Regions:
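Charged catalytic cores and adjacent phosphate/nucleic-acid-binding surfaces used
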Residues: 2-3, 7-24, 32-35, 52-177
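Phosphate-handling active-site elements
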Residues: 27
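Short beta-strand/loop segments at the ligand-binding rim of alpha/beta enzyme cores
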Residues: 39-45, 49
Length: 177
């Protein structure tokens, strides 16, 4: 089992720490979050790096920490526009980063959209070596699929519906002010 955490940074989206021992506080800068992952001896994994539909670290944030990135996600089925995944694959190839993929499943229906076949490993370094040689198998996804999953996870439950209504009220109030 790999203990990891997806951490929301202050303004540059999310970064995943793998092989962690402690929780990492939310709201740190990207650089501070990466430093905290490293302090714990963890690996730095950048998820959905060019999904411009969400807050993500752009080139200006990734290039300064390039040496600290252990793996970068080149396929995420929840990315609404396929070219964002393609851009991540080009970035990984250009900078010789280890390519990874994840289902980013927030609901059970999203499981199995990506499979990463890799040999057994023991510890962070063997994990990286195994991931470098891994086979990534993906299922194509459509914008409709992504939006349906998003609906299921945010509005199909009573709590999700309440959150969505509250968010709409806040947006309307902000537009009026």
């Amino acid at each position: 089992m790999i203990v990891g955490e997806e951490v929301k940074t202050a303004t540059q989206g999310e970064v995943i720490g793998l092989f962690l021992n402690e929780r990492i506080p939310r709201g740190l800068s990207l650089e501070q979050t990466v430093a905290e992952i490293r302090r714990q001896g963890g690996l730095v994994y950048v998820p959905h790096p060019f999904d411009r539909m969400h807050t993500v670290p752009g080139y200006e944030h990734l290039l300064p920490i390039l040496e600290e990135i252990d793996a970068i996600e080149i396929f995420n089925p929840r990315v609404a526009i396929g070219s964002f995944n393609e851009e991540a694959a080009r970035f990984a190839a250009k900078y010789r980063l280890i390519a990874a993929a994840g289902s980013d499943a927030h609901v059970a229906a999203g499981l199995g959209s990506v499979r990463v076949r890799m040999r057994d490993f023991d510890g962070p370094q063997e994990f990286l070596e195994s991931l470098r040689d891994a086979e990534i198998h993906t299922k194509s996804t459509s914008l409709l699929y992504v939006q349906a999953l998003k609906f299921l996870e945010t509005k199909a439950t009573p709590q999700g519906a309440r959150r969505a209504r509250r968010a709409r009220r806040v947006r309307r109030a902000m537009r009026k002010s």
